[in-house]
Amino acid sequence: MKYIVMQDAFFVVLLLVLAVPLGIYMYKVMIGEKVFLSRVLEPVERFGYRLMGVSEVGMSAKRYAVSVLAFSAVGFVFVMAVLMLQGFLPLNPEGMKGLSFSLAFNTAASFVSNTNWQAYSGEAALSYFSQSIGLTVQNFVSAATGIAVLFAVIRGFIWKKQKTIGNFWQDLFRVTLYILLPLSLILALLLVSQGVVQSFADYSVVETLENGAKQLIPLGPAASQIAIKQLGTNGGGFFGANSAFPFENPSSFTNLIEMLAILLIPVALVVMFGRAVKDSKQGRAIMTAMMIVFVIGVVAITISEQFAGPHYQGVATSGSMEGKEVRFGVGGSSLFAASTTAASNGAVNAMHDSLTPLGGLVPMFFMQLGEVVFGGVGSGLYGMIGFIILTVFIAGLLVGRTPEYLGKKIEPYDMKMVCLLILVPPLLTLFGTAVAVMMPSVQASVSASGAHGFSEVLYAFTSMGNNNGSAFAGFAADTTFTNMVGAVMMLLARFIPLVAALYLAQNMAGKSSVAASSGTLSTKNGMFIGLLIGVVVLVGALSFLPALALGPIADFFTTFK
């Protein structure tokens, strides 16, 4: 246990050390300031703008939102076409056939919405062309879209009496060129150096040591996709077993760098926020609130997996190892599970369905909080800003003052947008779960009975309704109902809060700042951090406690039989 504590502490310290300079760098990218890569990338940037016919004129929230939706719609159609027609496309050495309409629809919606829910196994269903040209490209642009929208939201708070919130095409291109591509290149090279595959060769047939049996070894351009799947909080694995598969995550070192990659940009964006609003204490307050909830979750999962699993007389074990890789152990698996669900990533290095009841409850609850404990790149922080405004509003009601945040007064219109930001994901999750449990096809998809069977359904629709993408593997997802309903849920959960955030940003940008007074609520001290954590957890608890009581909580009490 001491080793696990030291490992987790080292991870958090290293994460913060890396995130601070990256956050400062991203702030310079956001405001268009020159960075050390400018000499190399500026000509590429100018050429890209000319090629796309992009002007640098600012956009209103409506125009920004239309641009996001149109760009995402084109990506959706392109990915769906690639998946259904992959049998006729190149880079298909294994002769993979096109996906069914419902599965292609679900997969396209999943990757366009930055969810990466996978109702298929990559090595058995997709060609190299589909993986690299279809899905990997969407991993980049869906992540860049989230960060671009966050840029617009931040401008809403730092600009005064403006009618625009930036230019989507410029934000999208700069994020991709200056942030995602360089980081992905570095991470991909690191992964390849450690044995992660990157090849367009045919699958290999090898003779095993047991009876000389033949085994097919899948290959592919995995490292390049894994790099952006982690950095962009996408999470979709090149192989079906995701980061539990040795070709994706072969060692403890790759496990460390993949976990760092999951949280690096979300944490750095908080640093960037503090720099952008010219008050680093604001960023530190948000970081502290997120980190407290995250650390509590890591501790809860680790203790549950280390001590709450089955014990057998005379057998010395290092915790519950069912569904876990020996090379990662309880510590590496628990930290990964917390990171991937706190950050809206969804990649897994252990099977979450095999976690103990309380060990599975924490990742589920992280998602149900709205993916704001770091959350997805961009979307996590603008979701947390929604909770901050809600907290300020509640505190203002308690003392009878007009609430304000960063010098901007909070008005009824702002609260309407915040409600859309906060309430859409839980409504989709609970509605989807309620409908699903009544469907015979979903009932047949569940591998377990009783409380754990309900947990499998609840986890699946929580994951899709909050754009995470992880799953309890006992849930058979490739059915027409789950594919179609899940796709609609993922798209709504992504784009309704996104559009609400843009309109919130424009309304804020049009206001002038008000001077802080002695009665202004401080949003950077310990009291506010406690209030913010309380509001985030309370909204999650009120929304999901009845469902959790029927699922993982009831599952926990069945272990005492």
UniProtKB/Swiss-Prot annotation:
Matching Pfam families: KdpA (PF03814)
Leader sequence residues: none
Chief location bin: membrane
Key words of the record: Cell membrane, Ion transport, Membrane, Potassium, Potassium transport, Transmembrane, Transmembrane helix, Transport
GO CC, alphabetical: plasma membrane
Entry's transmembrane regions: 4-24, 65-85, 133-153, 177-197, 253-273, 285-305, 380-400, 417-437, 484-504, 528-548
Membrane topology: Multi-pass membrane protein
Location in the cell: Cell membrane
PANTHER family: POTASSIUM-TRANSPORTING ATPASE A CHAIN (PTHR30607), POTASSIUM-TRANSPORTING ATPASE POTASSIUM-BINDING SUBUNIT (PTHR30607:SF2)
Function: Part of the high-affinity ATP-driven potassium transport (or Kdp) system, which catalyzes the hydrolysis of ATP coupled with the electrogenic transport of potassium into the cytoplasm. This subunit binds the extracellular potassium ions and delivers the ions to the membrane domain of KdpB through an intramembrane tunnel.
Assembly, per entry: The system is composed of three essential subunits: KdpA, KdpB and KdpC.
Name of the molecule in the record: Potassium-transporting ATPase potassium-binding subunit
